[in-house]
């Protein structure tokens, strides 16, 4: 062991030495500068308690504040427009959460809770525990000894039900593996058991193998291999996901509790339980709160829960504003860091460097300054997180009480965590505290969370420093200099042998980066399934309208090809707000002033506004672009996979609409099926339309309504409604025909336009959106008011169509002037 001067330690605390260790640092020059701007409030503070809570960036709070200042978010249990906005935004956040963990709603559901502990309690209260009987063995609740108190606390619920409890060490899980095959009796046993373990220890930062998930589920690892039945795995990911990517498609744990303030720093008091949908079937909920019932009776013991898992388990009104803030958390995290993989590399590099230097510090007599509690040398990013747990020792090898260290750290504005960190099992293991010691310490007056750090000279807890995505090399410097200045008996000695050994091995990089996979759905073309009677009336197709962007202006053509989802490029784009919720003319009437133009030859979509310079985007985005942003959104309750059209068009739209928004396009390979009116027919693929591929209106019906409106008003106002084309535009139909009789289309089952066949799917129910003048974006009560009167209270106008084509047929072209031959429905009450 060589003696070095304090100057050598100062050299060790330089950024050049840090980089020589081969560490990754930061997220690029621009991003690091941006982070410095985001956390100005901690200037002069060395914050090293990110495992307790990370820090929120200023832009997250500003974005959330701007969001709730611009939008009216109502109670999601209501059905008004503000409530629908809340509901849709919350659903968008659910998708973001699942995408963040590389899974989808097909495999997992998100249940919002008040925190990770509440998520754990939810599992404890609803898991189908089975007490032991003469016929079958009882359930086993098993947990790793290195677990948070909130996990071990499940034991309180199981004890009352006669359920067995098994606590196992990490070594036991891996060494006592199955060495026998299952018997028939074991295969048939359905007794449910639960195994709980942390993806990362909140005490030491040790990462436990995610392969435990499948190992326990398949009953290859202990204790599952010795207790037959059906094993479920609860993966406590709260500590892990703050700095590491979690891929649930590879490691499909049944229950995954998380806490969002660990990830974003805000909001507090909000967590979630991610439930694998197959495992959700076993949960048994007894209490039912507001919003969870499909139906119930007050005078009978009759209750039917809602079919959706989240709706069944989220009692009462969820914390919807806090949930909405998560959107800004994900967006800001992506903007500042690029990915969770980048965060993992950055934080592990800081932790490994700090561990390396701290472990080499020695007093003048050669005794080490720190006893570090870990199971590795911080060489593998797959085995160790960004946490260092330790005790400081004086020159005689005695433990310096953690309260004393904490008080000294406060003088230097260094924020660390002390105690046992709600993890008694790990604390006992690393500090060699026996069961009897715990009881004796309690008798001596020490309880969890107090400042009694030593009992009979033995530590009751330890010190923990932990790093977050905004942590800097300066934080490492400040902490290490604090230790040397305050707790080292000078002159300082560095353990050069250990330093050389630790510096010789480069940290292991992750095997692969996280990349969400889109959902894919298979559809086939619809075929003709029903005959009808021909309608002898003479009709022609008078107008063809394409609506490339939902709720924006129409693009009128004289002929146009059909695509697999309707008219080619019809409603493939939509404008969404900053939370990914679709904007429509109901909330943003100015959308109708945006004129899209599809240029097939140039392969572009041009957007133009009167008085402004136009902007173009490609018709078909290149999915090979590495910077392409993908997301999930909702259209009429359906999930849709989309791609973002870029910052330039986003800025263009945001400036015009006066609020942050983006243009997104349906992914070319994503297919969505029409829901209603098909019977036994093959699925019909849709674009971003609300209900069906095509909307048809009849000019005779428009004229009938036009006359009804005129009759309501005196001659002074009559001229307003004499423009038939203006009224046609309000109904935003793709196909406008001229039949002889008004509302004759209501009785059709099929029709042929030229040589192209269509099935009538149903009538189009109208809303207040037809009250928007498509030329001026002003709102009027008409024509909805008169439509209701002349239709005897009904507000349907026009019919939905689906294209009927033979398999693998070429897509036809529709042209105005084509003959329209309808068939009358067998039942006029069909719709």
Curated annotation (Swiss-Prot):
Q: Which Gene3D superfamilies does the entry link to? A: Type I PLP-dependent aspartate aminotransferase-like (Major domain)
Entry cofactors: pyridoxal 5'-phosphate
Q: Which reaction does it catalyse?
A: Mo-molybdopterin + L-cysteine + AH2 = thio-Mo-molybdopterin + L-alanine + A + H2O
What are its E.C. numbers?
A: 2.8.1.9
**Where is the catalytic site?**
422
Metabolic or biological pathway: Cofactor biosynthesis; molybdopterin biosynthesis
Where in this protein does the record say N6-(pyridoxal phosphate)lysine is found?
262
Q: What is this protein called?
A: Molybdenum cofactor sulfurase
Give the species this sequence originates from.
Danio rerio
């Amino acid at each position: 062991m060589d003696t070095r001067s304090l100057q050598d330690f100062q050299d060790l605390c330089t950024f050049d030495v840090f980089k020589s260790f081969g560490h990754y640092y930061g997220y690029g020059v621009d991003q690091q500068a941006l982070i410095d701007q985001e956390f100005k409030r901690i200037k002069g503070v060395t914050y090293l308690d990110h495992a307790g809570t990370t820090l929120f960036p200023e832009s997250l709070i500003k974005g959330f504040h701007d969001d709730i200042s611009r939008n009216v978010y109502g109670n999601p249990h209501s059905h008004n427009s503000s409530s629908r906005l809340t509901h849709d935004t919350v659903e968008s956040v659910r998708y973001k959460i699942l995408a963040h963990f590389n899974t989808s709603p097909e495999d997992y559901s998100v249940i919002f809770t008040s925190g990770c502990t509440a998520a754990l309690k939810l599992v404890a209260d609803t898991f189908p525990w089975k007490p032991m009987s003469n016929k079958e063995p009882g359930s086993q609740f098993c947990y790793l000894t290195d677990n948070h108190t909130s996990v071990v606390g499940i034991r309180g619920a199981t004890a009352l039900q006669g359920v067995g409890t098994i606590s196992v060490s990490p070594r036991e899980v891996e060494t006592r593996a199955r060495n026998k095959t299952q018997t028939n009796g074991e295969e048939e046993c359905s007794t449910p058991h639960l195994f709980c373990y942390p993806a990362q220890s909140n005490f030491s930062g040790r990462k436990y193998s995610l392969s435990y998930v499948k190992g326990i589920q398949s009953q290859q690892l202990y204790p599952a291999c010795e207790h037959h039945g059906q094993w479920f795995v609860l993966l406590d990911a709260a500590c892990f996901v703050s700095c590491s990517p979690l891929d649930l498609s590879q490691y499909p744990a049944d229950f995954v509790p998380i806490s969002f303030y660990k990830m974003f720093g805000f909001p507090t008091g909000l967590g979630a339980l991610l439930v694998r949908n197959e495992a959700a079937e076993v949960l048994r909920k007894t209490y039912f709160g507001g919003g969870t019932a499909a139906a119930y009776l007050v005078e009978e013991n009759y209750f039917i829960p809602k079919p959706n898992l989240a709706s069944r388990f989220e009692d009462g009104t969820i914390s919807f504003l806090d949930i909405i803030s998560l959107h800004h958390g994900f967006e800001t995290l992506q903007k500042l860091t690029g990915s969770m993989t980048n965060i993992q590399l950055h934080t592990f590099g800081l932790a490994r460097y700090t561990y390396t230097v701290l472990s080499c510090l020695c007093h003048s007599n050669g005794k080490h300054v720190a006893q570090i509690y870990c199971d590795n040398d911080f060489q593998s990013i797959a085995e160790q997180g960004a946490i260092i747990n330790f005790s400081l020792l004086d020159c005689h090898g005695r433990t310096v009480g953690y309260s004393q260290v904490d008080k000294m750290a406060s003088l230097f504005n260094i924020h660390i965590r002390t105690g046992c960190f709600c993890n008694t099992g790990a604390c006992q293991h690393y500090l060699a505290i026996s069961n009897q010691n715990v009881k004796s310490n309690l008798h001596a007056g020490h309880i969890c969370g107090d400042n009694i750090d030593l009992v009979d000279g033995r530590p009751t807890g330890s010190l923990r420093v932990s790093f977050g995505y905004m942590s800097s090399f300066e934080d490492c410097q400040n902490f290490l200099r604090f230790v040397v200045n305050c707790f080292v008996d000078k002159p300082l000695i560095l353990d050069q042998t250990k330093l050389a050994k630790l510096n010789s091995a480069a940290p292991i990089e992750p095997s692969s980066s996280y990349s969400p996979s889109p959902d894919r759905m298979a559809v086939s073309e619809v075929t003709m399934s029903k005959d009808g009677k021909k309608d002898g009336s003479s009709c022609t197709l008078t107008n063809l309208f394409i609506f490339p962007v939902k709720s924006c202006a129409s693009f009128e053509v004289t002929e146009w090809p059909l695509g697999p989802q309707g008219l080619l490029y019809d409603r493939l784009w939509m404008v969404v707000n900053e939370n990914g919720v679709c904007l429509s003319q109901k909330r943003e009437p100015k959308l109708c002033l945006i004129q899209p133009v599809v240029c097939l030859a140039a392969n572009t979509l041009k957007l133009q506004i009167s008085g402004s310079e136009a902007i173009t985007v490609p018709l078909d985005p290149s999915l090979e672009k590495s910077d392409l942003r993908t997301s999930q959104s909702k259209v009429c309750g359906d999930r849709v996979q989309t791609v973002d059209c870029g910052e330039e068009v986003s800025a263009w739209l945001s400036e015009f609409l006066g609020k942050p928004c983006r243009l997104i396009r349906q992914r070319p390979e994503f297919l969505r099926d029409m829901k209603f009116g098909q019977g036994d027919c093959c699925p019909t693929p849709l674009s971003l339309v609300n209900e069906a591929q095509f909307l048809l209106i009849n000019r005779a019906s428009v004229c009938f309504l036009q006359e009804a409106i005129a009759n309501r008003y005196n001659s002074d106002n009559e001229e307003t409604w004499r423009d038939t084309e203006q009224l046609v535009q309000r109904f935003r139909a793709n196909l406008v025909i001229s039949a002889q009789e008004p509302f004759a289309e209501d009785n059709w089952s099929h029709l042929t336009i030229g040589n192209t066949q269509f099935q009538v799917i149903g009538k189009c129910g109208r809303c207040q959106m037809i009250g928007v003048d498509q030329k001026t974006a002003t709102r009027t009560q008409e024509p909805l008011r008169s439509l209701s009167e002349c239709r005897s209270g009904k507000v349907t106008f026009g019919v939905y169509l689906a294209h009927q084509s033979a398999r693998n047929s070429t897509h036809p072209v529709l042209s105005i002037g084509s003959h329209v031959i309808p068939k009358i429905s067998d039942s006029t009450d069909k719709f």
